[in-house]
Amino acid sequence: MYNNYIKEEAELIFANSLNLSRKDVAVMSNNTTSSIITIGRKYGSAGRQIGQEVAKYFGIKCYDKELLEHAANDSGICKELFEHHDEKPTNSFLYSLVMDTYSFGYSSAGFTDMPMNHKIFLAQFEAIKKLASEGPCVMVGRCADYALADNPNCFSVFVHANLDWRINRIAQKYNKNAKEAKDMINKTDKSRSSYYNYYTNKKWGSADSYNLCLDSSKLGYEKCIEEIENQLKLLK
């Protein structure tokens, strides 16, 4: 992995000298993919950072909170509302109501009369599909794997790690003590789990729900990145 890192840095220096983009470098190096990679993650497992590095390797975009901005722009709903409802559970009726309304579009009376949290999910669902139609990319969280379940190019990944490893990482990152870090982890994981389980017919974090599951505390950050890259190369 270290040799790969040196190689990538050399390629970027060369690219900068020629004013090339990361995508140009990926094509020149044959580091290309046709996949839309979705990353589910336990809080503190480094799933977002892993997704960002995979995107850099293949010269494609990575969408995390950027998904909220796209959904806000497309729907006309203010971004702050998306941030307020981001990966937070509502009630168990949401899935059926949203999916019934999905076929009507934003301009329908059904959409207009929906509660705001329903509108948020529907707009986000639409934004995920739209971005995926534009080409390969990485999407982090927001039930993207479920939104793209019918897309043959979707490759879903879930990143997890043992609790002690995550507590240490979050404590260092946010200058928290162990108890504060553990509380942050439990609260966020509970929210993400409830959100995913409400909106989909799958179980958050279950191996059956994803194409690939990785333990970042056991494999390490770089090995997780490498494993995703290798799996995607096999799909070419």
Describe the residue ranges of each PLM region:
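Glycine-rich phosphate-binding P-loop
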Residues: 38-55
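Extreme N-terminal, non-catalytic leader segments
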Residues: 1-34
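Short beta-strand-centered segment that lines the nucleotide-binding/catalytic pocket of NTP-utilizing
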Residues: 60-73
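Pre-Walker A (Motif I) flank of P-loop NTPase domains
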Residues: 32-40, 135
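RNA pseudouridine synthases
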Residues: 131-134, 143-154, 169
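ATP-dependent small-molecule kinase phosphotransfer cores
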Residues: 72-136
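Small-molecule kinase domains that catalyze NTP-dependent phosphoryl transfer to phosphate-bearing small molecules
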Residues: 16, 20, 92, 96-97, ...
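Conserved phosphate-donor/acceptor-positioning beta-strand/loop module used by diverse small-molecule
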Residues: 150-173, 178-186
